[in-house]
């Protein structure tokens, strides 16, 4: 199991992430949205697998096991959302699912990613 989140998520968070070719597994008590930016990754949530690229995303409910691996160079915008957050519609996370992203929304995701990159501490 991956331990990206040892500390409980009590407020929404945003991060830019890239994933390696070796498959990892995660399970946590908060909702997550993984939006493709560059390259591709493969993700399986509750037994359903899909590729994520710049035109797609995964909606992952709290408590859903997900297995994932990057395909070559890749980068995703990851939103971590507390399961009890009032601002998150409960029906959005009734079930895990991959979704296609509208091209206009893809542009917005890129702008958010650029701002997140500027705000991130140097690694």
Regions found by a protein language model. Give the residues of each.
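A cytosolic small-molecule/anion-sensing beta-strand core signal
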Residues: 37-38, 53-54, 72
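Amphipathic alpha-helical segments enriched in hydrophobic/aromatic residues interleaved with Lys/Arg
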Residues: 86-123
């Amino acid at each position: 199991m991956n331990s990206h989140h040892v500390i409980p998520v009590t407020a929404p968070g945003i991060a830019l992430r890239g994933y390696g070719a070796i498959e990892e597994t995660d399970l946590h008590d908060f909702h997550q949205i993984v939006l493709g930016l560059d390259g591709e990754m493969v993700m399986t949530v509750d037994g359903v697998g899909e590729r994520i690229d710049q035109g797609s995303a995964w909606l992952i409910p709290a408590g859903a096991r997900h297995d994932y691996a990057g395909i070559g160079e890749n980068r995703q915008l990851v939103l971590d959302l507390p399961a009890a957050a009032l601002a998150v519609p409960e029906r959005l996370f009734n079930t895990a699912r991959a979704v296609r992203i509208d091209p206009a929304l893809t542009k917005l995701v890129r702008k958010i990613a650029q701002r997140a990159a500027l705000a991130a501490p140097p690694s």
